[in-house]
Amino acid sequence: MSSAAVAASRRQSCYLCDLPRMPWAMIWDFTEPVCRGCVNYEGADRIEFVIETARQLKRAHGFQDGRPAGPGKQLPGKEIHASGDPGSRPPQPLDRYPLSSERPPRLGAEYQSARQANGIPVPNGFSKPDDPPELNRQSPNPRRTSGVPPNLVPLVNGSMAHAMNGRPGQMSDLGGNKRPASVSSTEHDKDKHRPDSLTPEISDGHKTRADDWLNKNKTVRELMTLNPYDGRFKKEHMQQRVMYETGPASKSDRGKHPKNLKRKASPEPDGEGTAGKINGDGQQWLPSASGDGLKMPPVPPPSFTSPPSTISPHPRTTPPEAGAAAAATQNGHSPIAALILAADNAGGNSSPKDANQVHSTTRRNSNSPLSPNQRRLAQGAGTPHVPGMDAVHPQSIPDSSVPSSIPLCCTLCHERLEDTHFVQCPSVPSHKFCFPCSRESIKQQGATGEVYCPSGEKCPLVGSNVPWAFMQGEIATILAGDVKVKKERDP
């Protein structure tokens, strides 16, 4: 016997794709031998239903009439006959497996012994090597009989009742063929001689399916029970989480404070319809939100709530901006202003001028009555100090955020200063100078030597008696400003 013939005799045809496969490519855990490709394509949880559908289609399209089998072809499943003695009895199209005592079904310990052939394990439950080659190609699996799991019985019965309407003979064949492998031959004869009425056969199919479901492999039972459990309880869990978040508010509270419903686990829009549907009006299987298990304490209105602890980055201090933000929130303003103020309080790393500029703008927008001078007075009187307002050199903070009633003026010429465009003495906060006066002072003192405060005094640095002086880069910037202005005015 050539190697090609040996390989062909070892191949097994898949029940779904009818292609010859090697034993390692076959899976025997379902009611029919199927290849791994079909199982991966259909999914292990749906393969039983696909096998049952293919079985009904083969039966409906007349695969039971006798046809000769080619050397490499699989015979249809309904043409497999008894292998005991071919001439002892006529071939019966629907008698799929031999039920004589010569070949008992391989279940339990016998199935384990069937996988050992001369001490060599045969992979994945493949039939014994002493079986005839034609049986190896015809998928004779006596321990697998057709049966539908209980959760698929109504669907299969309903569809077959319509598909087989007007074919009572074929329906009786269907009912008789649903017997498990352990049914005796006498019971099989009784099934054959039953009247061809539709209802008794379907009820008999119900019983045999239930029995066969108990005899089914544990893997198949677990796989078939996964899908309904997964679909139902995942949805219920999501809906319960929505009820926890939106259930406590009554209808009046919902109208007043819609921000309680801002964060949801459900993509449905806000509104009364959503809450009514969640509370059990639309779905009967969900527990209602009025049950004791899902009751939550009512949320107090925002006017009684203190500002959240996360508004200020410093937990032991109460900056004036945080109090102003709380007052603005209680007065009905948007909470965005409170968040902006909190971000400003935390932003002490920026330059002093920019920080004060941001604070003054935000304070005017949020209607806060505090000015930097009042803040300094409050700090001197014992109000907790705001760490976010500290700078590297406190004296270099320009008092740029004084309200418009007290304009910024130059110390020398008393001209009004712009908010950010002037020279500030780092030692004396009241020393503010415009750029023209600063230029004149630098020119008078001589730009090459030490240039001190434009006021004419030698203001000392903080904590020392050494007077401060302009750096060369600052002098160049102040002197270059005059040139830039002239260039801008040129046509």
Curated annotation (Swiss-Prot):
* Localization of this protein: Nucleus
Show the segment(s) annotated as Disordered.
60-213, 245-330, 345-399
Tell me yes or no: is Nucleus among this UniProt entry's keywords: yes
Give the record's keywords alphabetically: Metal-binding, Nucleus, Repressor, Transcription, Transcription regulation, Zinc, Zinc-finger
Compositional bias annotation for Polar residues: 347-376
Output the Gene Ontology cellular-component terms: nucleus
Which InterPro entries does this entry report, sorted A to Z?
Answer: I2BP1/2_C3HC4-RING_sf (IPR044882), Interferon_reg_fac2-bd1_2_Znf (IPR022750)
Describe its function.
Acts as a transcriptional repressor.
Task: List the protein's name.
Answer: Interferon regulatory factor 2-binding protein 2-A
Record organism = Danio rerio
